Amino acid sequence: MHKAGFVNIVGNPNVGKSTLMNQLVGEKLSIATFKAQTTRHRIMGIVNTEDTQIVFSDTPGVLKPNYKMQEMMLQFSESALADADILLYVTDVVEDPEKNMDFLEKVSKMSIPVILLINKIDESDQKTLGNLVTKWHGLLPNAEILPISAKNKFGVDILFKRVHELLPESPAFFDKDQLTDKPAKFFVSEIIREKILRYYDKEIPYSVEVVIERFKEDDRQIHISAIIYVERSSQKGIIIGHQGMALKKVSTEARKSLERFFDKKIFLETFVKVDKDWRNSQKELKHFGYSPE
């Protein structure tokens, strides 16, 4: 008997969905930073054994859209409700359980198994956790509730075992040697964007999109050319920095991470261009890959 299924991870921004995804898959596929709204796309990570295939899916945090880009991100999250065999709803110990009742209402009506994960329990106490469990039981009475700490891997093995038990009988959906549904270029752009998220403040990281113009690989090295798009000329100056030092720092850190990711020598070129108000342009969003399949 072979088991396979789509296990989709949803929840509000900054509750630890991407950290959990990376722990479950055993690879760093999703950006995880302290900033909210880090994940923009739906990213699949595939775990294979001889008789199972688990297709985990990380999604953008659910939020009220302010831009067309965020509308697209919300569509990624809602599509994860539609095709899930098992749903992992992630919250944490400080989030108000009633923060996003519209989305929660959709989750409560689902007929598939739902596991409610209360993350970051290392930052809480037993009384607070107990009160949260009671509150969540009232909001999602049909969900299983599991306290975890994704960062510290606490409860992750228990979760993985439970997911395996709940998987439906099915043939594999992907080749057994496949790790993700995304191409190499996608992870290059995400790694560069992660460095921008870490090194720039305020609105700058959220106004950035990274496009890989060139990706040429041989046995020993990879040559990459990346364009960092911003919305305004003033943002371009901030990204580049005085005498190009800020961009150089980001590029150097990105290159180091890329060399670890691909286990090859990386030659990375980065350029900065202005694409005015791209976050509200349907045409540009489609060009940048923000179209749910």
In which residue ranges do the predicted regions lie?
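Conserved glycine(s) of the Walker
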Residues: 16, 155, 246
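Active-site glycine-centered loops adjacent to acidic/histidine catalytic or metal-binding residues
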Residues: 58, 119, 149
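Canonical P-loop GTPase G-domain recognition
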Residues: 113, 122-180
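Conserved C-terminal guanine-recognition region of P-loop GTPase G domains, centered on the G4
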Residues: 75-143, 216-218
